[in-house]
Swiss-Prot record:
It comes from Hyperthermus butylicus (strain DSM 5456 / JCM 9403 / PLM1-5). GO terms for biological process: glycolytic process; lysine biosynthetic process via diaminopimelate. The keyword NADP applies. Its EC number is 1.2.1.59. Pathway: Carbohydrate degradation; glycolysis; pyruvate from D-glyceraldehyde 3-phosphate: step 1/5. This is Glyceraldehyde-3-phosphate dehydrogenase.
């Protein structure tokens, strides 16, 4: 099987997860990753046998720390077919001219503005539209969670409108410069929050409004979602739809899975690396239906949920899989993703 050659620019929260996911795929080769600082994650990459590429001006700094770079970022781009930009939000735009000069396909993250790429991407919603594109933007963690649920529900009936409240984590576990520590902060105070606008980059005709607050936790986001459909459905219909959708798990609170802390502990007990939960978690008991109205609560692990979509985005631009079903089957099998109910 011919394998697409992939590089990852950035080896932080998303980059390291995407890089390791690429290494598990049968049709992809991880050529290398980039680092700008010779820190512990650079040493970790080397320990995993991952070639590390650095800015030209940083070669000696890395060598002084005992890290021998495989080359420069420009040299990495000469060796790859696809580059996944996992740099901090807004930085991808600075790198884009470099990618274009190298003639590589580009995958950006949701921290970039939508106009950076030809298409904003979510596997369950628009995989086929992404085939053969030069550039894609994988939408943010919260948007990925919303879109998985919305595009799943839309299999039952067209979705007329969505109203959602996003309860955001304040920081990732490793972050020390973010907050709040002792407050609940509207983010933003004005309505809508940016999440609705981001959903509309994939589903432009959807009537959606979101509001968001940030709370002092690091584990996961929580969404409280109200959707109105074009025709009445039953609760059994909704449960069955979520249960049969890839990358969605129904959590039964009666088994002690009634909080994000317990979900994370369950992931630890499963032996998940970094307690990653790439699946969207929908609380089974929260699902309520009243005719055309559907309500539920869901949890999003912000560090991991976009990883499968990044892998699918690589397949889309490289045209390695022609359908969403095909790429989901390969990605989810290789990453050990679950669907159905837990525990």
């Amino acid at each position: 099987m011919a394998r697409v050659r992939v590089g990852v620019n950035g080896f932080g929260t998303i980059g390291k997860r995407v890089a390791e996911a690429i290494m598990l795929q049968p049709d992809m080769e991880l050529v290398g990753v980039t680092k700008t600082k010779p820190d512990y994650t650079a040493k970790y990459a080397v320990s995993r046998g991952i070639p590390v590429y650095v800015p030209k001006e940083s070669l000696e700094e890395f060598q002084a720390k005992g890290i021998e770079p495989a080359g420069t970022i420009e040299e990495l781009l000469e060796k790859v077919d696809v580059i996944v930009d996992a740099t901090p939000g807004g930085t991808g735009r600075k790198y884009k001219p470099l990618y274009e000069k190298a003639g590589v396909k580009m995958i950006f993250q949701g921290g970039e503005k939508a106009d950076i790429a030809e298409l904003s991407f979510s596997t369950l919603c628009n995989y086929e539209q992404a085939l053969g594109k030069t550039s894609l933007r994988v939408v943010s963690c919260n948007t990925t969670g919303l879109l998985r649920a919305i595009c799943s529900i839309s299999r039952l009936a067209p979705v007329r409108r969505v109203r959602a409240t996003i309860v955001r984590r304040a920081a990732d576990p490793k972050e020390i410069k973010r907050g709040p520590v002792n407050a609940i902060k509207p983010d933003p105070v004005k309505t809508p929050s940016h999440h609705a606008l981001d959903v509309k980059t994939v589903l432009p005709d959807l009537d959606i409004v979101t509001m968001a607050v940030v709370v002092p936790t690091t584990l996961m986001h929580v969404h409280i979602v109200y959707a109105e459909l074009e025709k009445p459905v039953t609760r059994e219909d909704v449960v069955a739809t979520f249960e049969s959708t890839p990358r969605i798990l129904l959590a039964d609170a009666s088994y002690g899975l009634a909080s994000t802390a317990e979900l994370v502990e369950y992931a630890r007990d499963l032996g998940r690396k970094r307690y990653d939960i790439p699946e969207l978690i929908v609380w089974l008991d929260s699902i309520a239906v009243n005719g055309v109205e559907v309500m539920w609560m869901q949890a999003v692990h912000q560090e991991a949920i976009v990883v499968p979509e990044n892998i699918d985005a690589i397949r889309a631009v490289a045209e390695l899989a022609k359908t969403a079903e095909e790429t989901i089957r390969i990605t989810d099998e290789r990453l050990g993703l679950l669907k159905g109910r837990i525990p």
